[in-house]
Structure formats: C-alpha cells, structure tokens
Amino acid sequence: MTEIAADREIKICCATFYQSDLVRALFGDVFHPGGLALTYRLGQAIKLGPGDRVLDVACGRGASAVHLAERFCCHVTGLDYGVENVAAAQAHADDEGVAHLTTFRQGDAEGLPFDDGVFDAVISECSFCTFPDKATAAAEMARVLAVGGRLGLTDMTVNGQLPDDIQTLLAWVACVAGAGTPDAYAETLRRAGLGDFTIEDQRSALRDMVNGVRRKLMGVELAAGLGKLDLGDLDLDEGKRLARRAVELIEKGVAGYTLITAKKE
C-alpha cells in the first residue's frame, strides 16, 4: 500500500468510526476528553468574542461548534471528513437555534477549502493527532487564520515511545498511536508560522473519559450480544484491551491530554 493510500485509509476509518452507533453509545455527541466544559475553557483561552469568525476542524457532530456559538456569540464554521457528521451537525445547530451562527461542510484538514486569512480563530479538539500529515494540517490552519488570529488545540499526548502492541489502526482512530509530546505539537505549529504558545496539562480529563468508556464497554458488549448494537468490523476485545492499556499509560505518565494555544504573528 502506498503512503497516500495508507493516509486515506486512516482518514476514512476515522470518519467511519466517529460516525458509528458504537461511538455514540460510548461518548454521546461529545467525543473528546473534558466534554463541553473543556471546550468552553478552550474558547476562553483563545479569547473568543462576539462576531469572531471561528473554524472548527474535525467538528464531528457539531456539539462544540454549537456550544461556542451559544456561549461566545461567534460565527462558527465546522469542517469534518465524514458526510454523516456534517448532516448531524447542521441538524443539531437547527435544533439549538444557532443555525444563523453556524455553517458545516465536508472537507479534509490537510486541504482546507477556504481562502487565506478568513478566520479569527481555528480550533481542533482531539483530532490533530489523527491527521496523517500533521505538518500540512498545521500549515493549512495557519494559512486560513488572519494575522493576529488564534489557534486552539486540545489533544492526546504521548511522552516516550508507545509500546508496539498499541500501534494499530484502531489506536490511530482512538487518538493514541499518532499522538506526540506537547513540545512536538508546538514545534509543528511553529514551523507553520505560529508563535506565542501556551500549554496546559489536562490529563485528568483524559483519565475520567477513559474510565467512563471502560464502564460503558460492558453495556456495549451486552447490547451487541442481544443484537441491539451493530459493532461493524470493530473488534470489541481489542477495544477493551486498548482501554485497559490507556489507563496503564495514563497512570505511568506516558499518555496525557493537553490544551495548546498559539497566535499567527
């Protein structure tokens, strides 16, 4: 398989995984550690305000985009690789009465379909580590930011080398295998032309989420056994193993979660 084909497989698997009934059973409509409370903290950290033009890269089903529009009265454009997610996000915005403040479209983080400098802020939650070409994604996010615009990321981090048994495709879509250190993320963003960094440790949010997923996996297994939930091609035993390993890695300080902000200067 060529590198381009492998990258495309990762993107398709990520989109399919995060549109699945299984993911909604495990996470609801908010897929990232910390939930909407951490989304609000991210909005504060990049100083969102009324009228700001915000891009949410890998917006999923739109929970964060809608929340930011409601709380900060900003105009949010959500972009996701999954067509079903885009439709669900628009429906969610309609239901919450913020359709006038939100727009959703399908697209690729490594080739953003927007002109240069059209956003005051760009965010991406628990997604940057899944992008196969992080340098290109960072350059694209910097490109669409206006001068003085702010970038905000929350994402998985890994300090040290991950064990071989967690370097799997499922680990990629579960935001583990492609993660780096906070400093590595910052360096990638710096090379894209961003600066003025802040970094916050948010590992407690990851620990809480993983423990919640482990509890819910028991219910998922029961529902699947009763024919009430389609697991598709997902190996549930592998999912449970990854969850156990994630807890071990968090406790050892190998895996974590971070909030990073930067500015286009």
Predicted segments, located by residue:
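A short acidic, Gly/Pro-enriched loop at the edge of an enzyme's catalytic core
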Residues: 110-121
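Short alpha-helix
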Residues: 178-193
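Conserved Class I S-adenosyl-L-methionine
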Residues: 200-265
